[in-house]
Each structure stands twice: as structure tokens, then as C-alpha cells.
């Protein structure tokens, strides 16, 4: 029997499996639905610092993602493909590599919601543990020697829209920020990314490669978990479909679900853990009535397309899509510190136009995730419900007006044939001058997401029935079962979610070995 089975080898799961297996007396099995791959075997689409091909090309979606997973971003839109990594490294092997820390105030909010052990003083030191910051590692509050390199591309390597956004935002009065992960990390900045020697560095390379020689760590790829086996209120194992080997039941003393904000809740629902009415409607016996899938959120993003002058268009397939961003506090609608981000997109695929975008880093709208079938090979139904909360719409409207000012600066207007919204064909100044009800309608058409799924197995205080897991990651009312990934976020971390998700894995692993 295994001591622990970890489900999912992504941003959090790789950290959990690696940390728990540091004790040679603890037998750990890591199950990954996608392929088990080695760093020295990684093909170009996984190595390149440009994530656009692996995200958008169908052949790579089928190889490295869940190709049939859809979500509806905003009510009234059609459901579209939702990219999530499938393979060791999870979404860290196909995301934008962004390594931004969550905001200290956000973690203090988690603690205020009853999540003891998740305040800024508890969480922020773990960011130093996981990083190998090549530029600021020796500075107070930073780290060197951790499993994940943090790199900032020198400005001379940036793309034209990176430089345009930087110069236009500075000219518009936004301050320069040398270190976005510093205590006052807000302003015009270079993205910190997980990269080494101009190649992506996922949690597979950072955590699992160094741990592979351990006799007590077993890694199995192409292992699709159907459900958790539960007896008398205790998790006893898993029912798993292993490619080429059929279906097996595997026993363990403890189970940790780190399958991500889409598939961890789906596994719980198939296991009879979730809203009782939904489970009964699917013919699933109820093991525990909990609000699984009821708190889903992502970061809304709208983009204006930028058609660069011919001579400025990138031609190197390894050109990064973005190096520069602007983070700021809107001062509106309970946004809090660093609730917004503006993003440069040098291209959306080599040969295609670039863009400039604005997104929420503190989203209040909440969506749902529900089963479409009890078959584990069928992805769940995701309704993101973006912009439903008026606090989100108000700040997105303000961002349109900010971008209208920034894109009028010569640093951006001077490099473009045109800049306009993709669906409505409006320029940003035109959109900014619309009456509120018309701008509302435009944003509902134009808004997508940043692929930062979170919140679907929400953490709440011990004894608080409004959550799915307790502050130690244990599923409420079920012994021997935890969740450790972005799905447990009780509210927004106000950053790209990858780095905070790794920290969640580190934190839960530490709680398990105390």
C-alpha cells in the first residue's frame, strides 16, 4: 500500500510529490493523466519560450492538453476551447511562464476569511523557497537555489509592443518597477518568468527530475483517475484508468488531489462529493454535500489588436509573446492593491498581429463547474460567468479609458498601422467615449480570460460549511483526502496563478509532514 497518492503532476502536484518523497520512509505514487516525459526529451513546443504554438495548434492541443475542454467566458458568448496542461508539469509546461507572486494583502484576506496558516507572514516566505531569482535572489525577501528559475529578459531582447507599452505607460505617468515581486511590486515592469537558457522551465524539470532517483517515488503517466474510493467517511484509494492496462483500484493511506481547478473538482463530483442535488441528478450516491465547483473564477481580459508596421513584425518562432506589463491599483470597487494589469502581446502567433490587453487581477465574479457525464474521459461543463459582478465591469470600463490614453502615445501609435477591438472593430478612443450601457455591451462581446482557473474547491475555515476544504487542505467530512492546487483559493491572489499554485503545493506538503 502507498502512504500517499498524489493525483496530477502540475504546478502544485509536482511540488507535493517531490516534498513528500524527501522522507525515504514515505512511499509516494504520483499519477498523471497525460504523458510522463523527461526534460532531456522535451520537444520544441515544450521548450520554446513562445507558448503560442502549444496553446493554439490543434496537434499540440491533442498531445499536451485536454482537447475537448470548453468554457463559456461571459454569459451570451459561445463556449470555446479552454487550455489546460495534460502531462507532467501540468499547465506550467504550456503557460506563459509568468512567475509573479501573489500580493501580501491578498493572503491576509485569506486569513481573514478563516484560512489560518495562509496569511502573508505564512505564505510570502515560501515564494523565496521555490525560486532561484537570477537578478534579485540576494535581496531581502527573495531566494536563490530554489527549484524554479526566475528570469527577466533584458529590454534589448523585447518585442516592439513590449517597448511601446513601456514607453507609452511611462509617458502617461505610470512608474517604473524594477522588481514586480518586490514588496511594492506595482507599475511598468518586465515580467519575471520561469526560464533558463532561453527555454521554458516547468515544475517537471524543477521538482520531479531531481526526485526521480528516489526508490520511494513512483511516477505513472497516462493514468486517468475516475474517482476516490470512500468507505465509512474515509478515502481508501482511487479507481484509475491506466492506458493499455485497463482499470485498477489502488489503495493508499492518504490521497492528495492536485489535478487542477478543472479536474480536481470533477474527480470529487464523480466520487460523490459535491452539491447533493447535482449528484443525485447524475445518479451519483452522495458521500458528502459540499459546494464543489460553485466558486470558480478566472481573470477577465479584453484585447485591442495592433497591426504593426511590416518591418516590426516578429519572424523568429521563439519570440516571446510578452515581456512587459503594467500593474496598478484602480482605487475602484473594492479592487484593493494591484487589482489590474495591462499586457503587451508582441504577436498572437508568428505572422499574426499583436495586441494590447487589460485584465482584472482581483475578480469578484464567480462561475460554476458541473459534470457533463460520469465518464472520466468527458470534461466537465464550465460557466465562468465573467463580468457578472458590477465591481468587475466598473474596473474593466476604467481600463478601456486608460488604454485609450496609453495607445494614443507616439510610442504605440507610431508603430502601428491600426489599433482596434477585434469583434466590434472600434478604436479604443471610440470605445472609451461610449455611454456606459454601450461600453458594457462591447466588453461582454470582447472579453475573454487569462486562463487562470481557480476557486472551484474553495478553502474555508474549520467548521465553515461554505467551503470544500479546510485550511490544511483536508476535504470537509472525509478523512484521508486533501486538495492542493489553485482550486482551493478562497479569493483572488491578484497575480498570474502559477507561482501561487506552486506555493500551495509547498504549503500543503509541509502541513502533511508536521
Q: For the regions a protein language model found, what residue spans apply to each?
A:
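N-terminal redox-cofactor-binding region of secreted/periplasmic oxidoreductases
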Residues: 1-514
